[in-house]
Regions:
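Flexible, glycine/threonine- and acidic-rich loop/arm segments that mediate assembly and lattice contacts
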Residues: 1-240
Length: 240
């Protein structure tokens, strides 16, 4: 069982004039642009790692190699709508079914399955909308901190920890879980000990051919999703 590596890269171009003039707040324009490109690549990576993309060897000169995203790996602890099927080993994509409301019962089922499979469910990763849904689960009522009459009070309208029968689960919102990577209708139950980002080539820069007065630099990395045991995680799918 293994995954494929994928390359993510950005190219920045700096003109001689821009590099030579005084720049407020920074010494090197190249360093500044590479820092921005690094942040962009990291966002792209997170988007891909959580996706329903399948692993592929690609074709030399035409089709890029791709890694298998998290949704395409999770199979054992899967709770989906009618007609849905789970992904498998990074080579088979998850197939969506009939959408249904994200309920506490669905979450409890997947947490229990992860625990029974030997995992320790520690993180519930959700999109912003589902974060608000979890905060409204039964048992979480509106509360106020006790405070002196001359001090403001705090209204508690969020749940950051879900105390399950099998331990505390941190509820983590992720803005990169959206329709663009098929994450708008899923929630992940994760054991972080059994998943990681593995690098074949860490972040590195390559000087490219100069075009006129513009110097170009490529920033790239080659990486993959390392799923050490897919049964240590779970997925709630087809959620509204």
């Amino acid at each position: 069982v293994g995954n494929r590596t994928q390359i993510s890269q950005k190219t920045v171009g700096i003109t001689g004039t821009l590099q030579a003039v005084d720049k407020a707040g920074r010494k090197s324009e190249l360093a500044y642009q590479l820092s921005k490109a690094s942040s962009e690549i990291k966002r792209d990576m997170e988007h891909i790692l959580l996706s329903n993309q399948t692993a592929s060897n690609g074709t030399a000169g035409s089709t890029a190699r791709t890694l298998g995203g998290l949704q395409a790996w999770l199979n054992s602890n899967f709770d989906g709508g009618s007609g849905s099927t789970a992904g498998n080993l990074g080579t088979t994509a998850r197939v969506g079914g009939t959408d249904r409301t994200f309920t506490e019962t669905i979450l409890k089922t997947v947490i229990k399955e992860v625990y029974e499979s030997g995992g320790t469910p520690k993180i519930l990763m959700v999109n912003p909308g589902h974060k608000q849904t979890v905060s409204a689960f039964a048992g979480i009522a509106a509360q106020r901190y006790m405070a002196p009459s001359d001090a403001p009070t705090t209204i508690i309208g969020a749940a950051d920890i879900y105390l399950s029968d099998f331990g505390s689960v941190s509820v983590v919102p992720n803005r990169f879980m959206n329709a663009n990577n098929d994450c708008n209708d899923v929630a992940f139950v994760l054991d972080p000990e059994y998943a990681a980002v593995a690098f074949l080539r860490p972040f590195q820069t390559n000087e490219l051919a100069k075009t006129g007065d513009s110097e170009k630099t490529q920033l790239l990395c080659e990486y993959t999703l390392e799923v050490r045991n897919q049964a240590a995680h779970g997925i709630c799918a087809d959620l509204t």
